[in-house]
């Protein structure tokens, strides 16, 4: 969704920053979202979030593959799931509940870089709903501020080595409509991981 396969348009006033891999950004807006480089050298706040190892350019959420380090590990215990990305070695610890209705809201004053994730099982699919982003990261790509973003991720095991990953981004302050993306994650062989 949407049916045309295109990202919805930005709403009036939504922030869209350029310069993902260096170069100019729009003004001197902080935090600097470019992956490498920055807008100055006076202090760490002038450098990009990826360069500072705060948020990787493909570490999500949502997980969107890019140049390298696209590995994601999923661990599960009785009460939690852990979604760990190789990029930045970020681990989201996701408490698990019985259903969507049981997900307790976090105080709206608490805002986190990767949001507050909570999950539940919908038959064979792990559903993770993330809210309370800090507004300093983008909603998707370089658009938006994430402050109003609600991200819903669905992880469905297809076979022994494949997970179907689907995500839906809802951010009415940035995009004119919600949108959904999906891709398959396959488990690399132990030999591939050693390379």
Locations of regions flagged by a protein language model:
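PEST-like low-complexity, intrinsically disordered acidic/proline/serine-rich tracts
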Residues: 1-187, 191
């Amino acid at each position: 969704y949407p049916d045309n396969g295109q990202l919805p348009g930005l709403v009036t006033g939504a922030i869209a920053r350029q310069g993902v891999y260096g170069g100019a950004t729009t003004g001197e807006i902080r935090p600097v979202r470019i992956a490498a480089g920055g807008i100055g050298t006076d202090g760490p706040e002038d450098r990009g979030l990826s360069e500072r190892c705060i948020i990787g350019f493909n570490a999500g959420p949502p997980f969107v593959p890019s140049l390298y380090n696209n590995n994601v590990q999923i661990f599960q215990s009785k009460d939690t799931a852990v979604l760990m990305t190789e990029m930045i070695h970020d681990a989201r610890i996701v408490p698990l509940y019985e259903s969507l209705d049981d997900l307790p809201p976090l105080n709206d004053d608490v805002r986190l870089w990767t949001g507050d994730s909570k999950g539940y099982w919908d038959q064979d699919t792990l559903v993770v709903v993330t809210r309370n982003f800090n507004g300093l990261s983008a909603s998707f790509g370089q658009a938006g501020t994430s402050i109003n973003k609600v991200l819903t991720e669905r992880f469905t095991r297809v076979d022994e080595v494949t997970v179907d990953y689907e995500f839906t981004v809802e951010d009415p302050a940035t995009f004119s409509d919600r949108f959904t993306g999906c891709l398959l994650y396959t488990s690399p062989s132990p030999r591939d991981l050693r390379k």
